[in-house]
């Protein structure tokens, strides 16, 4: 346990208030530069190279919300959709803010990371280099119990929380639950089917669970009915982790955390646990003179698991936790944690997109494209903001007959496009007259020639990199299957694909290119004609020369191949214009026009009821038509409106309970021993998930070649209005969760 700090108002120490350590040396607070800081910067440099190659574009939004160096900060990040890429992206982009937002905002977040990740040698190296704070997770410690012991549910239908035990050989292996196990520990079924926490152990053969095993799978029902072997993990002590976080904050550092816990591929956030709130409250309770800024950070990926995709990183408005919160935490910890946790959850809604299921997400994205004027190109941050607002509007009016009707029409329209093989942004590009068809034919031939040229130019690098492409794909899919088997919340395991592609490429690429270089040196020494293009007979110089040449060839092929792929994507609408009957094309275009008009009318009617600045958004962004590039105007407009009246959009449908059951563990006599830091990641009421976006294709085809401590009173008023919007979301969340519980 952490050493208790003396309460200023009472002589008796308070267990849940940590010690404010003044002797802790923090190499990552921005005030010192040593070997640890240098390793951090080297890691950021490497990550930046990797992300420049893997992502086509990374946009950072709301950089002004990141507190300056010297302000204790917690970056609360969500959704955790790309395993190790997520924290690496946040760390690198936050450190690189010195180039866009000034050196004073260049922070070095140290992430709270699952202890199991530090057991992976490659991940452990970067984890230690970047000041990672390990946290044990109870589910990672599950181990098989004696095979002679079995558990079963005597009345699974009426009392699923009551678990009985029996022994195959009572003489040599007695059950003895009271001696073997303890409350707040974890039981697990075979093959990672389900886990459940122990509430109490009334006798040697009975266990009462805090919540029953999930019985959605028939295999679980079969095992609990007939009896099964099981796994067990002793309750964990998070005191050391909390103290490490407090030490970072007390020395004016920056801590990062994904409060959902492990990564997942669901379309909405997992429940947020109380640990993140206790980190901020414990720090200010120990030192009432300090203020902690809790900054929400949202990550948005367009095709997250694909090479050359796009990403948007968004920092939201900070929540300032001060000494007043600390005093409240000392007097009534549970209520204070609940209050702050709600604020943090609301703030995460403001920077993330949340849909109840995959179909709704696809409909919302299609609705945004239909609402957006055909030839207007919006920047990625604007697309993210509009998607978020549409999701929130849908959540509020989903039972409105007009919304139900529109959802069906949009869904049918998407199916029609799928049958033709078109994307929405390609529909209005289709031509119907004979003259236009002739022009399309000529354009098709020209683009085919260009595509062939770029394909040939990209061949050398593609051939060189083919072994890595193949191994990356095979190994990442293998890891995704393994992760899916172990996880209780993943759907397809797509959150693991990009991470393992990058890790495998990072390890294999240097090995492969060293091998290529050595082979070329041997070839140059044996073949005399090769000396024409080899600069020297020195083996080291030859190695450097060949290695650089191979890297340059691969990178050149990457860039030319990228243009070739964009050209290839633009061929389909030309082909459809030539081959498909004009009436069928006109029918699809008419359907789109009518659907766009109806959708716009409904948005214009309902939008102002949800967002006070709706008219301003529509006027400033969508009044620009006919090919006008509104990237700069729209981005600045969206940024201003994000500060003035953020939409706080969320799907509301599948977010976990705001008042986490972890709060019951916080009381005036409690400690930090078993407070959960990460979400339990229990499976909710989600239906399905996937991820597709036309925005990359649309951009590609059209282009083939703490807020400062002292804020003004006006901004305080705006923040108050933001809080009102967040409260509406919180209310909807609670209503939805209560409804799910009743079901």
UniProtKB/Swiss-Prot annotation:
List keywords of the entry alphabetically. Answer: Acyltransferase, Endoplasmic reticulum, Lipid biosynthesis, Lipid droplet, Lipid metabolism, Membrane, Phospholipid biosynthesis, Phospholipid metabolism, Phosphoprotein, Transferase, Transmembrane, Transmembrane helix
Q: Give the EC number(s) under which this enzyme is classified.
A: 2.3.1.15, 2.3.1.42
State which ranges are Cytoplasmic (membrane side): 56-442, 474-501, 553-743
Q: What class of enzyme is it?
A: transferase
Location relative to the cell: Lipid droplet; Endoplasmic reticulum membrane
Could you tell me the Gene Ontology terms of the biological process aspect for this record?
Answer: CDP-diacylglycerol biosynthetic process; phospholipid biosynthetic process; regulation of triglyceride metabolic process
Chain ranges passing through the membrane = 35-55, 443-457, 459-473, 502-522, 532-552
Q: What Gene Ontology terms describe what this protein does at the molecular function level?
A: glycerol-3-phosphate O-acyltransferase activity; glycerone-phosphate O-acyltransferase activity
Q: Indicate whether Repeat appears among the record's keywords.
A: no
Chain positions with Phosphothreonine modification:
673, 692
One GO cellular-component annotation of the UniProt record comes to: cytoplasm
Biased-composition ranges, Acidic residues, are 691-700
Q: Quickly give the catalysed reaction.
A: sn-glycerol 3-phosphate + an acyl-CoA = a 1-acyl-sn-glycero-3-phosphate + CoA; dihydroxyacetone phosphate + an acyl-CoA = a 1-acylglycerone 3-phosphate + CoA; sn-glycerol 3-phosphate + hexadecanoyl-CoA = 1-hexadecanoyl-sn-glycero-3-phosphate + CoA; (9Z)-hexadecenoyl-CoA + sn-glycerol 3-phosphate = 1-(9Z-hexadecenoyl)-sn-glycero-3-phosphate + CoA
Residues modified as Phosphoserine: 632, 637, 647, 651, 654, 657, 664, 668, 671, 688, 693
Q: How is it modified after translation?
A: Phosphorylated at a conserved motif involving Ser-664, Ser-668 and Ser-671. This phosphorylation plays a critical role for efficient TAG mobilization. Phosphorylation deficiency at this motif increases the enzyme activity and consequently induces de novo formation of phosphatidic acid.
Q: In which pathway does it act?
A: Phospholipid metabolism; CDP-diacylglycerol biosynthesis; CDP-diacylglycerol from sn-glycerol 3-phosphate: step 1/3
Role according to the record: Dual substrate-specific glycerol-3-phosphate/dihydroxyacetone phosphate sn-1 acyltransferase, catalyzing the first and committed reaction in the de novo synthesis of glycerophospholipids and triacylglycerols (TAGs). Can use both Gly-3-P and dihydroxyacetone phosphate with similar efficiencies and has a broad fatty acyl-CoA specificity profile. Transfers a fatty acid from fatty acyl-CoA to the sn-1 position of glycerol-3-phosphate to produce lysophosphatidic acid (LysoPA).
Q: What is this protein called?
A: Glycerol-3-phosphate O-acyltransferase 2
Tell me the classification of the organism that encodes this protein.
Eukaryota, Fungi, Dikarya, Ascomycota, Saccharomycotina
